[in-house]
């Protein structure tokens, strides 16, 4: 474990993230513009894809970071039996959920039960599939629906706020099952589906289209919200949530329904709307990419 990763164990995660939230919403022209210009230069942000390409037009750093895209700049895969990539970013890992465990990095894994905070809910994804997508600071930070789904419930699982960058993922055991996260359960035409919005160091908030700001407030116990009977349906490719700084979204899929798109591997760059998985034909067996051991 390198020095920087070791240092992250000692940092006051929530205090730093709360401070980041205040700074992100600051509208002082010199402060917000310095932050925006610094991130654009450091991470090579492509503002030509943004609905507002003028870096000086954003009232705050958060408005810049959660910017919308130009209409038509991302399009969904036209096949209705194709599950869509929920975000721009890079594949951290993907593959089968083997013996209830989700692969994180070489020598690292965690259980679906740990991730979801619910043994019964995790059982629906035994032998299913997962995909972990990392959104870097340069990426579009809104998360969209892979397919049309009816919101059933959310689970706010408290935890740490480690960085979710590539080095941290390789070195911090069970990282995604330790960080604060919002677990969103959906019922779809293909069966159950979960999207997990994972918080991280300096992530100043997670917002959903149905509930607004969900994180913070940071929690000390698991909190459930039941949405059954509320008729909250979100269409395929529609926005469902956003991060107020870079982080990670994890998709869980049920067994024997999909096969992951064969071109996807760990570290693949991905864009919102491209194929994540294809529905299996009745006589087709599930296939999954090879993972590192």
From Swiss-Prot:
Pathway: Phospholipid metabolism; phosphatidylethanolamine biosynthesis; phosphatidylethanolamine from CDP-diacylglycerol: step 2/2. The record marks 246-247 as: Cleavage (non-hydrolytic). Signal peptide: none annotated. Transmembrane segments: none annotated. GO terms for cellular component: plasma membrane. Its main location: membrane. Heterodimer of a large membrane-associated beta subunit and a small pyruvoyl-containing alpha subunit. Belongs to the phosphatidylserine decarboxylase family. PSD-B subfamily. Prokaryotic type I sub-subfamily. This is Phosphatidylserine decarboxylase proenzyme. The lineage of its organism: Bacteria, Pseudomonadati, Pseudomonadota, Gammaproteobacteria, Lysobacterales. The gene is psd.
